[in-house]
Amino acid sequence: MEITAQMVKELRESTGAGMMDCKKALGEANGDMEKAVDILREKGLGQAAKKADRLASEGLVSVEVCSKCKKATISEINSETDFVARNPQFQALAKDTTAHIQSSGIKTVEELNTSTLNGVKFEEYFKTQIATIGENLVVRRFETISADDKGVVNGYVHSNGRVGVLIGAACESAEVANKAAEFIRNLCMHAAAMKPSVISYKDLDKDFVEKEFIALRAELEKENEELKRLGKPLHHIPEYASRCQIGEAELAKATKAIEEELKAEGKPEKIWDKIIPGKIERFYADNTVLDQRLTLLGQFYVMDDKKTIEQVIEEKSKELGGKIEIVKYVRFELGEGLEKKVDDFAAEVAAQIG
């Protein structure tokens, strides 16, 4: 059977494969379009398998939030190069995969691979995409968070697709939840930029805090040596690094020290109640450096750096007429924990021709 240019064009458009590959597949299939598609898929899958030993450390972080802000999904799909990450077909693949994960309630990569998308087993669909796009692609990780009637979730992905965040909040009422969606998205934007590791100091491991506190003091003392040499003001050396180190006894000790300071300054006791709260707030600010670095609630808000996220949430709760509490936080940064493979180009060429 004669293979026409129109047949090649049609097969190419339906599969995304190269022109010569389409022409050859049609020849092998004697012009049968369906058989030609199968032949290309078989060859494509073979090519995809060969690509699977190449590290995929570029790619995209994708976020999908349902219209009512009750469910949000974040995924990381890796490619080998940032060039492919900018490919509209790859971007569509990331978006479709994330939406499929959410709509199907998929929890694991194993579940994803055995699921069905557009009538095709996802694993087969994804390998076909690998063959068409021409690089190894990997669905590395994903997570979905959800909320009940009194909750709200939202998400944000930075414009370069390298960082994405989901945040979920429990609210005092459904009315507050409905009004809080945009605020939660703003918190996601903050977290994308400021990289908190956990929601609160309560989520930090105490042994980790103690080790970090020792390192922090050493860091500040070292810097103070240089500042002293230059005749510049020295850093304050904190007594603590996190609120998880400050219990009732520590707070009582700090309060007593403030009272003694006020007494030494000759401040009348009748005005201490007006002064002490501000000094306690300063005490916390000076002694929670680790919280400010690592916890969402302890960080100063990027849109108002005079207030912590915790303070901003309290203000928003009053504004909306009910309590808002952050209960879920997920942040993906592209390639976290992956080492980017550095290829020996000469060895790769030798392997291809040998």
UniProtKB/Swiss-Prot annotation:
Its main location: cytoplasm. Belongs to the EF-Ts family. The keyword Lyase does not apply. It comes from Campylobacter concisus (strain 13826). GO terms for molecular function: translation elongation factor activity. PROSITE patterns: EF_TS_1 (PS01126), EF_TS_2 (PS01127). This is Elongation factor Ts. SUPFAM superfamilies: Elongation factor Ts (EF-Ts), dimerisation domain (SSF54713), UBA-like (SSF46934). The keyword Iron does not apply. Keywords: Cytoplasm, Elongation factor, Protein biosynthesis. It is found in: Cytoplasm. It holds the Pfam family EF_TS. GO terms for cellular component: cytoplasm. The lineage of its organism: Bacteria, Pseudomonadati, Campylobacterota, Epsilonproteobacteria, Campylobacterales. The gene is tsf.
